[in-house]
């Protein structure tokens, strides 16, 4: 059996979208109830996906503006990014294309991205929207549209609180690294119209 491949997976996204909760939920099967900005240490574990053993290294980042200059230091050597937004925060959804995609393209061009909508349990929670009248839910269709717009191979909605699709997020991230999606070859207009006389 061959040695396991190391995969560095870095989570990014706005502050308070649930990046740390997602990581804690995945690594310990528990849900932290108090919000403390980025207290997750880097984590490494052997994971088997599609019969391949992978040493998965998880890196948490702080989404707050205060960390804009420090955060990119953790991008070096990343194999895949988990780009998270909250399904109950339109601002975090909009920042995927406004802030995060430009940052990732600048500091880590070509690294694949798994787009993740977090807090799935709250999207259908009527009481949450009564208590937070300004909150706007993001639909699955909107998430898929954003995935296409940013060119991410995968979009997954999950809930760290209920564990729904949490494992699927990290399995998808590993799969994207082990089996990158085939690039569609586009012929430029110049190639199509060129004729030699």
Swiss-Prot record:
Propeptide: 195-197
Lipidated residue numbers (S-geranylgeranyl cysteine): 194
GN (gene name): ARAC11
Origin superkingdom: Eukaryota
Keywords from the UniProt entry: Cytoplasm, GTP-binding, Hydrolase, Lipoprotein, Membrane, Methylation, Nucleotide-binding, Prenylation
Annotated tissue distribution: Exclusively expressed in mature pollen and pollen tubes.
Organism this protein belongs to: Arabidopsis thaliana (Mouse-ear cress)
Name of the protein this chain belongs to: Rac-like GTP-binding protein ARAC11
GO cellular component: apical part of cell; cytoplasm; nucleolus; nucleus; phragmoplast; plasma membrane; spindle
């Amino acid at each position: 059996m061959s040695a396991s491949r190391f995969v560095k997976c870095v989570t990014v996204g706005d502050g308070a979208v649930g990046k740390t909760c997602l990581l804690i939920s995945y690594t310990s099967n528990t849900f932290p109830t108090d919000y403390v900005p980025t207290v997750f240490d880097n984590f490494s574990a052997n994971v088997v996906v599609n019969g391949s053993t992978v040493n998965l290294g998880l890196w948490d980042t702080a989404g707050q503006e205060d960390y804009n200059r420090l955060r990119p230091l953790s991008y070096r050597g990343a194999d895949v990014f988990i780009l998270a937004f909250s399904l109950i925060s339109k601002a975090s959804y909009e920042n995927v294309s406004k802030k995060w995609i430009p940052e990732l393209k600048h500091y880590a061009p070509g690294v694949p991205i798994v787009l993740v909508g977090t807090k799935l349990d709250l999207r259908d929670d009527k009481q949450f929207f009564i208590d937070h009248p300004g909150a706007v839910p993001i639909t699955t269709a909107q998430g898929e549209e954003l995935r296409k717009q940013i060119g991410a191979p995968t979009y997954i909605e999950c809930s760290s609180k209920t564990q729904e699709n949490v494992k699927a997020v990290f399995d998808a991230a590993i799969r994207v690294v082990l089996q990158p999606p085939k690039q569609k070859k586009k012929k430029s207009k110049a190639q199509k119209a060129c004729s030699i006389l």
